[in-house]
């Protein structure tokens, strides 16, 4: 008598609410929380930082009290948080939330994190404080354009897509080369490293996208002005008073913070700071939408429709109830 093979369990469906800045993700997530026992896992590289509340449009205390939120306020602005850390933390949290009999909802707009979660990681070396300190010292002496020129010699493909003053990415690309001996462009082109941890899940993205980008741009300007009115400049000033923060840290390169830092340094006036902050947010939005449109499996909801929250709620419930293809 032949043995009966064990059936492979079907992967658990995980609803993911993705969208650019100012697309209404928080409203849709809270609407779902009013209907189901969910816990929200943030997919946002800015919300991880403590003491950065206004400029990141962090959910309010009341909103966070109404439904559990995860991966918010988990590290200090002086520290770094990687896509690999996000992947490990999120997979752990999904299991813990399910064990409590609740439903995880992934929500955010950092598409690099989502890609790392669903497609695996590249074999890039981790950050090395000593290498970074060396590169910082060289940049202080020679300037970032000089380091960009050095990068062009060892990794011309990466250098070609970076501006000569893009300190964070130039530093990372040189760091990768110094630690691995290989150009970052070569490592990124290699097959991604995967494991079985994510194979137990089927991630279904519900994408909030604008049918008219001009409407979203208007929202972005209104939101940036609201942040300024709420005390954003004071928030950045408090961070500046710390002796361990500087504008090249990942935290201070978040949209808005870098522009506010330049203003407080006296490099720009208030109007220019506002305009540059809004422009940078619009550019971020453009990149986020480009990432979303590269996901053929996504369920699209028009985020500027009058009933966009209701539409997003319906899409999320269909995903959770298994009423979607795939």
Curated annotation (Swiss-Prot):
Pfam families: IPPT (PF01715)
InterPro entries in the record: Dimethylallyltransferase, IPT, P-loop_NTPase
Residues involved in substrate binding: 21-26
Keyword tags: ATP-binding, Magnesium, Nucleotide-binding, Transferase, tRNA processing
Record bears the keyword Transferase: yes
A single BP term in Gene Ontology: tRNA modification
Enzyme Commission identifier(s): 2.5.1.75
Catalytic activity: adenosine(37) in tRNA + dimethylallyl diphosphate = N(6)-dimethylallyladenosine(37) in tRNA + diphosphate
Marked site (Interaction with substrate tRNA) residue numbers: 110, 132
Claim: Cytoplasm is one of the keywords in the record: no
Residues bound to ATP: 19-26
Region (Interaction with substrate tRNA): 44-47, 168-172, 253-258, 286-293
Names of required cofactors: Mg(2+)
A single MF term (Gene Ontology): ATP binding
Annotated function: Catalyzes the transfer of a dimethylallyl group onto the adenine at position 37 in tRNAs that read codons beginning with uridine, leading to the formation of N6-(dimethylallyl)adenosine (i(6)A).
Family (UniProt): Belongs to the IPP transferase family.
Assembly and oligomerization: Monomer.
Listed name of the protein: tRNA dimethylallyltransferase
Species in which this protein is naturally found: Burkholderia cenocepacia (strain ATCC BAA-245 / DSM 16553 / LMG 16656 / NCTC 13227 / J2315 / CF5610)
